[in-house]
Amino acid sequence: MNETITNKLALLPDKPGCYLMKDRQGTIIYVGKAKVLKNRVRSYFTGSHDSKTQRLVGEICDFEYIVTSSNIEALILELTLIKKHDPKYNVLLKDDKTYPYIKITNERHPRLLITRKVKKDGAKYFGPYPNAGAATETKKLLDRLYPLRKCRKMPDSVCLYYHIGQCLAPCVYEVSEETNQTMVNEITKFLKNGHSDIKEQLRERMEKAAEDLDFERAKELRDTIAQMEKVMEKQKMAFADKTDRDVFGFSYDKGWMCVQVFFIRQGRLIERDVSIFPFYQEASEELLTFIARFYLEKNHIKPKEIFVAESVDKQLLKELLETRVTQPKRGQKKALLDLAEENAALALKEKFSLIERDEQRTVKAVERLGEAIGINAPYRIEAFDNSNIQGVDPVSAMVVFVNGVPQRKEYRKYKIKTVEGPDDYGSMREVVRRRYVRLLKEKRPLPDLIVIDGGAGQIAAAKEVIEDELGQAIPVCGLAKDDKHRTSQLLMGSPPVVVPLQRDSHEFYLLQRIQDEVHRFAITFHRQTRAKSFLQSALDDIPGVGEKRRKALLKTFGSVKKIKEASIEDLSKHVPTKLAETIHHTLNKNKPNA
């Protein structure tokens, strides 16, 4: 904990509000709320935490806080700040999953549509439905029963829907407002669980058609009734009062939370939504934020009633959402809440089991890799890759995998210092030397295996440093790629020979991940270096920008990149206008290719 944080912790007030955690670049990485700021913020820096919270705390270098006059103000402000800053440690609600609704448009001649967007346009919306198939089946049934207008724009003549009895053709014939309203009322009644009455009417019409010997019509009505029963089949969980409800069950363990939302529509459980995410506040506070964002940010329609556990601040949620909030204590409602919480607990347990299984599989892959190359299991693997274009701005990068898992905090970047021109072997010798001379000097653990992105020459260069210069016996292997730049072969030994590995094995997949990761890290660093080098040299070559002026500009703007992004007007405040124009045009006329 740095001095800045220590000093700020001593000044925290005993009031509600929001806090914004920042990393070393000043980027906001987490936003939270608190009933008592002093207690909540201090808790991050005292006592023990789960691994997720430890990771967050490890990145915090500073924080801000905003005092509010009430808890509800703190909650509203938290939602605003999360939306504005999009901090990486705040839970991300799913944007890509929206449920379908059936819509009756607010038009002179209404239409029946399926939509995933609910708007305040005067239309009637029914749902959500569990999936597009369920909504489509219901709409098809209603189209057969109620011939509302189908075309988006009125055609000049009747369409196919008129001929099959699914449209009254208001484009050609007069359809009264009363007729349209009657159909809208019937559809509304049907979708609000009045299908039993409508089914009875259809049954009477079917029997009448049979009595009149109109067997084709009777069969048609019989099929319609069967379709209705299929579409509107009652589910196990149903309520007699037909109230629309959302039930929020949650469970948490090991720094993770699962929230299951049960959608109850017209008294029936039609669908659930599952979210699993790491959390960093008190569990009840995290759930409160989740529910608020669920409705305020993601366009979910608020039902007439919400069920939540007793640990949630009922009054605060009620004030924020302006809807009825219930904490069931007995009976069918409590059973439904318990069911949601049980499902949440099971989903979380399943996630942990999958994580554990994946970890076991990864560790097993590490052990099998060791067996394949004839060494002990390489639990710590360090991989190197060089990157340059014809020897320009040469760099190298190293990644670390422990038990098959990337350790990104241990990754390292190297600018090549001693090698001139495109000398890949010389670059490899330099970075391997720099890495392991330092580890030996600092008495830090050496890897069990060194992986080189390259073939025989790169392997030999690395072994020359490890074995001949440093006298270490660390196994070194190389990864060769095919003509499509994909991991192709594992090379080992002196001279290197191909180690046979099944391409669909977990150990081969592990090597592929390592090679892809070190290449990604190296190429990203090289692009950054090239861009910086381009800007720096471009600034140095501008007439009128000498050493003194260059330093003054860098001090004012902070970096060459910021100078490049500055407008001519901003630059003119520090240099003559003509020179400002020259600087702006020179830095922006050419951009390095990625």
Curated annotation (Swiss-Prot):
Span of domain UVR: 196-231
GIY-YIG domain ranges (all copies): 14-91
GO molecular function: DNA binding; excinuclease ABC activity
GO biological process terms on file: nucleotide-excision repair; SOS response
Keyword Nucleotidyltransferase: no
SMART domains: GIYc
This protein's GO CC annotations: cytoplasm; excinuclease repair complex
Compartment list: Cytoplasm
Top-level taxon: Bacteria
Keywords recorded for this protein, A-Z: Cytoplasm, DNA damage, DNA excision, DNA repair, Excision nuclease, SOS response
Gene3D superfamilies: 5' to 3' exonuclease, C-terminal subdomain, GIY-YIG endonuclease, UVR domain, UvrC, RNAse H endonuclease domain
Binding partners and assembly: Interacts with UvrB in an incision complex.
Protein family per UniProt: Belongs to the UvrC family.
Primary role: The UvrABC repair system catalyzes the recognition and processing of DNA lesions. UvrC both incises the 5' and 3' sides of the lesion. The N-terminal half is responsible for the 3' incision and the C-terminal half is responsible for the 5' incision.
Protein name as annotated: UvrABC system protein C
Lineage: Bacteria, Bacillati, Bacillota, Bacilli, Bacillales
Gene, per the UniProt record: uvrC
